[in-house]
């Protein structure tokens, strides 16, 4: 099948069970990593019908978080679907990236555990815009990009109003390099004060 961005095999970090999870973290540390990022759910650009499904059992994520902590590393979780986010937050990840379909329960958990939300509004806008272009994405991806991309703005607004901690971030490889600063504009447009947006990237 067509692979848009390439999918890693077991040697690159696909884990099946706690033992694989420990090995993957240790291998990444050996390779020079100082942060671990997991895909707690599928993605908008995953070559699959849905980007919402959880991709880890909660105990696998917990094992990743605990092992990363042994090497003074935090864990960030790419996530779009609510169930995958909840598992990741309860397991102790430091941040949720994208968080598009975040629900009220997830926001409550994030506040309880002090988990940061990195909304990547620019990425949502980018994929939604490109979904309008015939042939830009494979047909299995295009409906997801058109549906999920625009929702990040609303999620950001709700999370901000709910008091979830928010950190600045874009999505390397999706929105264009060198245009990261546009994220500040989006954050202010959707509710933050200019100083809050600046502090989200610097504090």
Model regions and ranges:
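Glycine-enriched alpha-helix->loop->beta-strand junction motifs that scaffold or abut catalytic
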Residues: 90-95, 111-116, 135-137, 163-165, ...
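Short acidic active-site motifs
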Residues: 24, 83-84, 105-106, 154-155
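Structural recognition of alpha->loop->beta junctions
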Residues: 86-106, 183-198
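Catalytic metal-binding/acid-base residues of hydrolase active sites
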Residues: 80, 122, 173
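Divalent-metal coordination cores built from histidine and acidic residues
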Residues: 1-73, 106-126, 130-134
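Hydrophobic faces of well-ordered beta-strands that scaffold small-molecule active sites
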Residues: 36-38, 75-77, 96-97, 117-119, ...
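His/Asp/Glu-enriched, well-ordered alpha-helical/loop segment
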Residues: 70, 74, 139-140, 148-203
């Amino acid at each position: 099948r067509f692979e848009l961005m390439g999918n890693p095999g077991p040697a690159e970090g696909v884990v099946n069970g706690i033992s694989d999870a420990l090995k993957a973290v240790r291998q990444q540390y050996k390779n020079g990593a100082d942060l671990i990022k997991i895909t707690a759910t599928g993605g908008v650009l995953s070559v699959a019908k849905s980007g919402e499904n959880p991709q880890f059992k909660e105990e696998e994520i917990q094992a990743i978080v605990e092992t990363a902590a042994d090497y003074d590393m935090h864990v960030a979780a790419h996530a779009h679907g609510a169930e995958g986010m909840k598992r990741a937050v309860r397991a102790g990840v430091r941040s949720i990236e994208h968080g598009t379909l975040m629900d009220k329960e997830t926001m409550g958990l994030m506040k309880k555990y002090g988990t940061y939300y990195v909304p990547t509004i620019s990425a949502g806008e980018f994929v939604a815009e490109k979904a309008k272009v015939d042939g830009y994405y494979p047909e299995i991806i295009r409906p997801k990009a058109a549906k999920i991309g625009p929702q990040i703005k609303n999620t950001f607004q709700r999370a901000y109003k709910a008091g979830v901690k928010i950190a600045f971030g874009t999505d390397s490889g999706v929105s264009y390099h060198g245009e990261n600063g546009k994220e500040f504009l989006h954050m202010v447009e959707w509710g933050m004060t200019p100083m809050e947006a600046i502090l989200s990237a610097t504090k």
